[in-house]
Amino acid sequence: MTAIVNAYIHIGFVEQISALCSDLLNKGYKKPLLLCDNVGGCAKVSRMKAVDTYGASPVSGLCGAAHLCRETSLPNVVFTDAGGTSFDVGVITDGSITHYDLYPTIDRWRTQVTAIKITSIGAGGGSVAWLNPLLGNRLEVGPASAGAMPGPACYDLGGEHATVTDADVVLGYINPDYFLGGKMRLNKEKAVKSLRELGKKTGWDEVTTALMIKKVIDAKMGQEIFKEVALKGYEPSEFTVFAGGGAGPTHCCGLASAAEMKRIIVPPISAVAGAYGASTLDIVHTYEKSRNTRLFDYAKGTYFTDFEMFNSIVNELRELAIRDVILEGFREDQATFRLELEMRYGMQWRYTPVESPLLFIHSTEDVKRVCDRFTEEFSRMYSAEAAFPQGGIEIETYRLFVYLNLPHFPITVHEVMGESSPKQALKGQRDMFWEKLNGFKRTDVYQWDMLRAGNVIEGPAIIEADNTTVVIEPGWTSTMTQQLYGILSHNI
């Protein structure tokens, strides 16, 4: 099925990439064109299969988030990207991305293209609010989206349905005169009209309807975050939310609260997290081979001893990798390798991907180290009580990653100067609705690019940037780091 899916999307892929290459060449670009893939790397167009690019944008965003969070010593982060239509979630643990989807579904088709695990749901700024008649006219938000055209009602491009963005405008969070840095004016009256129309059957006015939309979408996104972290065996409260996407910073406090998380990171590249992430990628190729290998026999109490067989499989994959490294124009000594093994206890149907501590094995002690790494990872995910050593320990798939480092822009570190007051960035005030404060309150509005390292902003407050709006709800505090990231903390 993987080959069929790849063949089906290959034609459109080639047409678009060929047009892009021609356009770049005509504009004087002479260097190779690199494309992002769904395993967190990039490669030349000539070395890329169409199916390997599926979902590459959110994967790039996740990789960019991991890069930024390592700079701020935040090891456990849940990456989120709330755009106009979808809400993407990925998990970073100990500063690394280790969770993969071994059989990702493309449209309705199950494929065998290993990809970094990203979960997406229909939730974003363009998500349409509606009343579900099957549930007594209960308010639902999404998965349908107004898209960019006609978009939310406030875009004034023909859209009539109330969306999350319309709710944010009516609640005062988004300034209609400063959307996209003032490049696009929003029509608040159209937003009010759409919300009133939606609230007719429930008896809500436009403000109540807007508040209910916010609560539903925040809960929906927060539940998805909680589920993704908890089902991987982690404690959600130990994670920091990375608020990405144009709508992410606007709803970050609400969704973090719903996910029981008390810290958020909002970098200045939030709205373009995927594009930024692409600039942080190195060239990565993946090679794999299925071969059942029993590493530990519980009944006999013996470990695997055919070291030559194990090493020959790894060597076979390594030779393929070196071939591609040379074809990419690099030397063999510029490449680094990482071996991942899909392992399980005997008679289990589910495999656990484990990073091998060794590329090759030469002794029983080496085999034991690999088995111990599997036991450690399995116990972390499912608890030690779920371990089943009586079934023995097996490898089903060998997967080799090869990395070629590319130059990247360094992250600028600013000196903390002066007092923590952000008064130099205060641009005004406007009325905003805060449920915890029981209504509309006059609220400070700050300009993002005027903030300095060390500035502290107590909620409620708003930080406006050209491509997003950061909503700091009551009970939250934002502190600007030396990298000029906003770190929002919940005041307990």
Name each region found by the language model.
Residues E15-S18, S22, S60-C63, H67, ...:
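Short, contiguous clusters of charged residues that form electrostatic/catalytic patches at enzyme active sites
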Residues G55, F242-A243:
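Short, flexible loop segments at the rims of nucleotide/cofactor-binding pockets, characterized by
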